Amino acid sequence: MGSAEIGAATSSGSALYWQRVVKNGDVLPIDAQIELLNDAEARYVSRGGLKLEGALKQLGLSVTGSTCLDVGQSTGGFTDCLLQLGAARVVGVDVGFGQLHDKLRSDERVLCFERVNAREPGAIAAEIAKLLAGEEGLDADMDSDSDFGDDDSHEDDEFTPKNIADKATNTLASDIFEPDFAAEFDFIVGDLSFISQTLVLPAIAPLLKPNGCLVMLVKPQFELNFGQVGKGGIVREAALYEQVEKRVREAYAEQGLTVHAWLESPIQGGDGNREFFIHASK
């Protein structure tokens, strides 16, 4: 492998030396064995990006120029996919904290809301509104020399609008939204774990613009009752998959959404479970 190829591989994060090589300046032993990851797997910050890419291709959907909401953003695989496919901006929400990949946290097209429970009606719109209303004092409150993501002293901070923007980049809501943004999205995507999306749907369906698209990953093990899921969290009975589809479709109909497609994810879950995508619109 030539130096140019190694340089390109390390820049893209697709080279391994015991652990991922992330910078061309990383120093490796002269006899280091370089292993290249599958190019498809290295394209996004997580496998979720490949799942969403496959679903959007199968559905023939374009996100170019769209304002998108990513529910259950986590590392940001879906967000990464949306941006690479041409989305104008992505708002991500997650109940967790500090999971979003640095590549996305520093992207001016991304606004990350952490420690937000998307199940609560109005929670997402309220956080956007608070940030837009309160960001006049955001610059003064932020120390541009600090590293918010790596400072352990912030791990237990109460969630506030002023700690949403990444301190290293000082991304502001006004860089992404107009002041009168009504918290309506062209596209909503989501990858939720440990909660049924039927419980979250009533809170996110109102955020979809008329004729907007909703593409959600369905994980059957989180849509069934505890006793229905087998050892290791694996769903094995075909009848249970049918039950999940029926239950989820009914939940979408209750929210006034039209379901256009139900398709199997091109990539299985990391635990070996079959996963599905549902495509709906308002």
Model-inferred region functions:
Residues 267-282:
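Core SAM-dependent methyltransferase catalytic element
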Residues 88-91:
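Short beta-strand element of Class I
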Residues 93, 97-183, 192:
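S-adenosyl-L-methionine
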Residues 2-62:
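S4-like RNA-binding module at protein N-termini
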Residues 75-86:
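Conserved SAM-binding loop of SAM-dependent methyltransferases across substrates and taxa
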Residues 198-213:
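A short glycine-rich, Lys/Arg-flanked "PGG" loop and its adjoining helix->strand segment in the class I
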Residues 64-74:
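Conserved class I S-adenosyl-L-methionine
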Residues 220-237:
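Short, glycine-/aromatic-enriched active-site segment of Class I SAM-dependent methyltransferases
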